[in-house]
């Protein structure tokens, strides 16, 4: 097999003192119960903050997990490691033909995990009902602007209508609450935030605005060029009354604000300016079978090699535990020596 190099060291050291049973824990006592599963690195958009206009060299098909391999890892995660929430991501998960099969197989596990999907919404209008029937509980749809010109400039595709149709279909199919994930453009983002919130309020969607993170394929991210939570909230407050939500945040990444005295909320995920790593409960599985204990991890643990080498479930479970045991205290974005991970977001999964 020819392996596409991603420049990421692989964990090979033993994890001294690591628990071999019980929750999926790290040395700081954080317990991972939320699994992010990247089904593919392919995407049908070319968002400026994610990849170049010409796209990327996709991972070869033989390096990707098969549906059966993925389902086996999902079973281990849920029945042995205590995973209670599974989110399917990409790339773009809707380009994966066996998506509904994987969702259905995951829903058949016991205890049944909560299942969500993050998607750009293109093609969702045609598949929302089938995904709901397969067992998917809810969706987050990435939408950075409801201005057609802004959307086309950000995504390099004229597909806003398809995304809006996907949102409507998801709501109709019962994939609720429907959430909208927005990464704001530095030039138009403050205006876009206001119009996005109005659109979401009008249609019954929940808006989540995410600070742009250094995960772009071209490594062009600049702290000073990205909009941060304080500025975003100030722009929203010029048009809406925002009151902090009284519900405990727990491990949720979004700080929620109630809008105009009603029950609707808007969330801001301040991954860079107000990191929440101490409450992180996530573990990540890439489309090519690598476990990552953080979006910004510099190391990975290769479960695909174990799968294809004949390892039993016990060995795979312990390898996954070892990967999470060594999770760093935080992502380190604000540290002087921070290095952006070699994998772009499209090959990690959101």
Swiss-Prot record:
Binding site for GTP: 36, 87, 118, 179, 282-284
Any one Gene Ontology BP term: Mo-molybdopterin cofactor biosynthetic process
Positions of [4Fe-4S] cluster 1 binding: 43, 47, 50
Cofactor(s) demanded: [4Fe-4S] cluster
Sequence positions that bind [4Fe-4S] cluster 2: 277, 280, 294
Positions of S-adenosyl-L-methionine binding: 49, 91, 142, 213
Cofactor: record remark: Binds 2 [4Fe-4S] clusters. Binds 1 [4Fe-4S] cluster coordinated with 3 cysteines and an exchangeable S-adenosyl-L-methionine and 1 [4Fe-4S] cluster coordinated with 3 cysteines and the GTP-derived substrate.
Listed GO MF terms: 4 iron, 4 sulfur cluster binding; cyclic pyranopterin monophosphate synthase activity; GTP 3',8'-cyclase activity; GTP binding; metal ion binding; S-adenosyl-L-methionine binding
Pathway: Cofactor biosynthesis; molybdopterin biosynthesis
Reaction(s) catalysed by this chain's protein: GTP + AH2 + S-adenosyl-L-methionine = (8S)-3',8-cyclo-7,8-dihydroguanosine 5'-triphosphate + 5'-deoxyadenosine + L-methionine + A + H(+)
Keyword Iron-sulfur on entry: yes
Protein task: Catalyzes the cyclization of GTP to (8S)-3',8-cyclo-7,8-dihydroguanosine 5'-triphosphate.
Assembly and binders: Monomer and homodimer.
Protein's UniProt name: GTP 3',8-cyclase
Native organism: Mycobacterium sp. (strain KMS)
Encoding gene (name): moaA
